[in-house]
């Protein structure tokens, strides 16, 4: 197996769902399915044994939920990227997924090309929250008063930094953010750098999760 490929583990209690994901992922030249599990306990054991780059995690599974499994895996393997993939587009699952350390939240009816893009983005350390509910939560979070998390910041976000941070939460890259906000890519890079400094984050995902969490915990 090519070590340069993104190693993806699948966690879903429905064999047909795993088969579909496996087919789509293994058809790519830059990624491969490194293992599969049908319940929460098995994906925890599999992850600790094989250390995949990305895990596609169903929420509702036997013996241990995807959320609980994600918490366990993230405590042992903080560099593993977990994407919650489910049929349930609810605020509860979005919140719980974020708290568990997931970097993404997608629906199972996501188009194959969007799924592949999300896996690549997760492997790069980017956050992907593209469901209607996740987008709504993120938008509400960034409309909230900055006092919500001001005490934890070295200095408050500027209006433009909040706009950039919101686009980061949608999974957009610097060039896409620049086009959307009508600024140069170098300007976006400067904003991203300042955002990471202000929330003491090592990467984009940490910055996004910090912002969302501080909008949730009022």
Swiss-Prot record:
<keyword id="KW-0963">Cytoplasm</keyword>
<feature type="DNA-binding region" description="H-T-H motif">
    <location>
        <begin position="174"/>
        <end position="193"/>
    </location>
</feature>
<keyword id="KW-0238">DNA-binding</keyword>
<dbReference type="InterPro" id="IPR016032">
    <property type="entry name" value="Sig_transdc_resp-reg_C-effctor"/>
</dbReference>
<keyword id="KW-0804">Transcription</keyword>
<dbReference type="InterPro" id="IPR001789">
    <property type="entry name" value="Sig_transdc_resp-reg_receiver"/>
</dbReference>
<keyword id="KW-0902">Two-component regulatory system</keyword>
<dbReference type="Pfam" id="PF00196">
    <property type="entry name" value="GerE"/>
</dbReference>
<dbReference type="GO" id="GO:0005737">
    <property type="term" value="C:cytoplasm"/>
</dbReference>
<feature type="domain" description="HTH luxR-type">
    <location>
        <begin position="150"/>
        <end position="215"/>
    </location>
</feature>
<dbReference type="InterPro" id="IPR039420">
    <property type="entry name" value="WalR-like"/>
</dbReference>
<dbReference type="GO" id="GO:0000160">
    <property type="term" value="P:phosphorelay signal transduction system"/>
</dbReference>
<feature type="domain" description="Response regulatory">
    <location>
        <begin position="7"/>
        <end position="123"/>
    </location>
</feature>
<keyword id="KW-0597">Phosphoprotein</keyword>
<dbReference type="GO" id="GO:0006355">
    <property type="term" value="P:regulation of DNA-templated transcription"/>
</dbReference>
<dbReference type="InterPro" id="IPR000792">
    <property type="entry name" value="Tscrpt_reg_LuxR_C"/>
</dbReference>
<dbReference type="InterPro" id="IPR011006">
    <property type="entry name" value="CheY-like_superfamily"/>
</dbReference>
<dbReference type="GO" id="GO:0003677">
    <property type="term" value="F:DNA binding"/>
</dbReference>
<keyword id="KW-0805">Transcription regulation</keyword>
<comment type="function">
    <text>Probable member of the two-component regulatory system YxjM/YxjL.</text>
</comment>
<dbReference type="Pfam" id="PF00072">
    <property type="entry name" value="Response_reg"/>
</dbReference>
<feature type="modified residue" description="4-aspartylphosphate">
    <location>
        <position position="58"/>
    </location>
</feature>
<protein>
    <recommendedName>
        <fullName>Uncharacterized transcriptional regulatory protein YxjL</fullName>
    </recommendedName>
</protein>
């Amino acid at each position: 197996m090519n070590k340069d490929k993104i190693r993806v583990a699948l966690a879903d209690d429905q064999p047909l769902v795993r088969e579909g994901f496996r087919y789509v992922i293994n058809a790519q030249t830059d990624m491969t399915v490194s293992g599969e599990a049908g319940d929460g306990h098995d994906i925890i054991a599999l992850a600790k044994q094989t250390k995949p780059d990305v895990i596609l995690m169903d929420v509702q599974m036997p013996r241990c939920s995807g959320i609980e499994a994600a918490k366990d895996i993230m405590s042992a393997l903080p560099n593993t990227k977990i994407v919650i993939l489910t049929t349930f587009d609810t605020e509860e699952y979005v919140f719980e997924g974020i708290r568990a350390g997931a970097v993404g939240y997608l629906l199972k009816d996501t188009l194959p090309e969007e799924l592949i893009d999300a896996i690549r983005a997760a492997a790069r350390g980017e956050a992907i929250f593209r469901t209607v509910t996740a987008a709504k939560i993120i938008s509400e979070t960034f409309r909230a008063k900055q006092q919500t998390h001001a005490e934890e910041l070295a200095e408050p976000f500027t209006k433009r930094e909040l706009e950039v941070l919101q686009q980061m939460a949608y999974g957009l890259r610097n060039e896409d953010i620049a086009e959307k906000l009508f600024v140069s890519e170098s300007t976006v890079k400067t904003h991203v750098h300042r955002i990471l400094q202000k929330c003491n984050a090592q990467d984009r995902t940490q910055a996004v999760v910090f912002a969302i969490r501080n909008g949730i915990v009022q």
